[in-house]
Amino acid sequence: MYYFLTQDLESAFKLTCLVKGTVDRTNFNCNCSLYKDYDFDVFLNVIKEAIKNNTEANGKFCNLKSGKVYLAVFYDDDVGQERGLLLFSIEEGSWFSNSKSKSAVEHLQVRFDSSRLSAGISRATAGLLRGLVDAGVVDRAIGGGSTSYQEEVKNAYLKLGFNMSYEFCYEKNSSSACYEKQADTDKQLEENIE
């Protein structure tokens, strides 16, 4: 299942739209649901940082605006029935795909640190995402990925035992190994890519 936090940042926290099954990019089955047991400021800070860094680092590719960024809690088909955390943009020609299609949702992986080849996330943001998992809001938080080096980064992570090109991964009821391993994998990733 997919939960989208929609509209502007303030109302985004209050309204979620539920999409059942596989994402249909044109037809959304919207059922309202509220998160009442978690601090709104944590969500807000995550979204604000994503907007700030994407806009500053990728202005010519990115159409990110506060009213057009969606936070999604989603069903991950690759790993089974887990909920994860990603950011989405609904703008035509979104930053990640640079697509000109008019799909309702364009995939935008979390990108917080443009200086890193694998589009990693900052420690501060990783801590916020980890907090969402620890609080039980989501079972799994992921971030990172790549743009021009997408396949190379994915292959590098496969060699390190990751199933996909995630720079950051933290799961409910698991050790913090994947979170703490982030800094140690940077050099290995660059070596594998080279």
Task: Annotate each PLM feature.
Residues N45-Y70, L86-S99:
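A conserved beta-strand-loop-helix scaffold within acyl/acetyltransferase catalytic domains
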Residues V79-L85:
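Glycine-rich phosphate/pyrophosphate-binding loop shared by adenosine-nucleotide-utilizing enzymes
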Residues V105-G120:
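A short, internal acetyl-CoA/4′-phosphopantetheine-binding micro-motif in the GNAT/acyltransferase core
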Residues L117-L132:
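Conserved acetyl-CoA-binding loop-helix of GNAT-fold acetyltransferases
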Residues L128, A141-K154, N173:
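Conserved beta-strand-loop-alpha-helix junction that forms the acyl-donor binding cleft
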Residues G144-S146, N163-S176:
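Conserved catalytic-core motifs of GNAT/GCN5-like acyltransferases
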Residues Y157:
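Conserved active-site tyrosine of GNAT-family acetyltransferases
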